């Protein structure tokens, strides 16, 4: 009797599993705690059907805040507590300073030459210096203040023009506003193909979330083609590259004084002067970082802040009262007006605790074998720091799942990675270099949305009916659009 193809594959898989079990070498080495695993896929079956950050958090609560995950071929250690985060990101920071290679980084990020994915070494150190001194300095972030103020005011006018009492998609409005702010900061103006550019960036962000088969089986190159991932990424990259080339070509025609340089001006100046070893592809990779990562993280944070406030009317009333008392009927908000509003800042800090932009941070990779608390960690082992779990650790946070901005009153926790129980932007050498720009793109938009309008759910729904389901991508977004009704 002939066997069907499905039956043949199933039998072959069973034989392979039994062979792997029988021939697996024994080891006397101290092993990190881990869940039960299967041959070939390792621990992936524990994460099926879950948000990765939540699934990993639940495994850590069962097996320990320093545990091992086998993700296909990739050996991974997961850190889920402030204690271990501090140990690894201080004592072993340089050991785990590399980034694992990914198919997305290879194709989309111009062979991993952007700031986020570049391997640790001289090129990355120069990029980091470039960010600190030029691209993302306090002075440079401040120079974009007028852009933020203009685009926030444009959003206010658009909402008012739509009419009081009519539902609008705040998700769409916020994303568009942040994208325009960053587009103007990067290129000096809203680009003519901005809608297409934004859609391509959104697609890239969708492709970079979760655990991808191409990255968990890196040696199985046929899977890159079989899954269709390589073809999809290549197609996206071609469109993206054409658009950025057009932007750069148009930009060469214009001139800017150094005092008013856009991000692209800075990069092209450094490239042309040979001050810094930048190629045309390097410039494009860095610009993509600035626009892509910045748009997604800031817009998600503003959305989550408003979502949490809708579900917590007491906090909403308190933050709006603070804004309206301080601004006293002022029409257009300037950043100086909101620098000393404590409750607004508490709301932002609590939002970042519950909804860190990158809940699993960006994975790192071990550069050399290391002994970690008696455990032998092999070269190229992947490191995941679950900031989502750390920020909700009940040992450090009372009522950890609740939205309570007041918990940060008189709380010295540093938002920039100095306190390891609170790591919204990561910590150590590979901490997010754009934190200051990201915060600026959250604070003013949020203040405008809360100051100018009252908000409620459509169709008479009560505040506790707001769907807070997550959708995992490069960042954790709301699964459903935030549709609210403004009144003014």
UniProtKB/Swiss-Prot annotation:
GO terms for molecular function: germacrene A hydroxylase activity; heme binding; iron ion binding. Keywords: Endoplasmic reticulum, Glycoprotein, Heme, Iron, Membrane, Metal-binding, Microsome, Monooxygenase, Oxidoreductase, Signal-anchor, Transmembrane, Transmembrane helix. Glycans are attached at residues 260, 379. Heme binds at residue 432. Residues 24-488 are lumenal. It is a single-pass type II membrane protein. The chain crosses the membrane at residues 7-23. It is found in: Endoplasmic reticulum membrane; Microsome membrane. Its cofactor is heme. The keyword Flavoprotein does not apply. It catalyses: (+)-(R)-germacrene A + 3 reduced [NADPH--hemoprotein reductase] + 3 O2 = germacra-1(10),4,11(13)-trien-12-oate + 3 oxidized [NADPH--hemoprotein reductase] + 4 H2O + 4 H(+). Residues 1-6 are cytoplasmic. Its EC number is 1.14.14.95. This is Germacrene A hydroxylase. It comes from Cichorium intybus (Chicory).
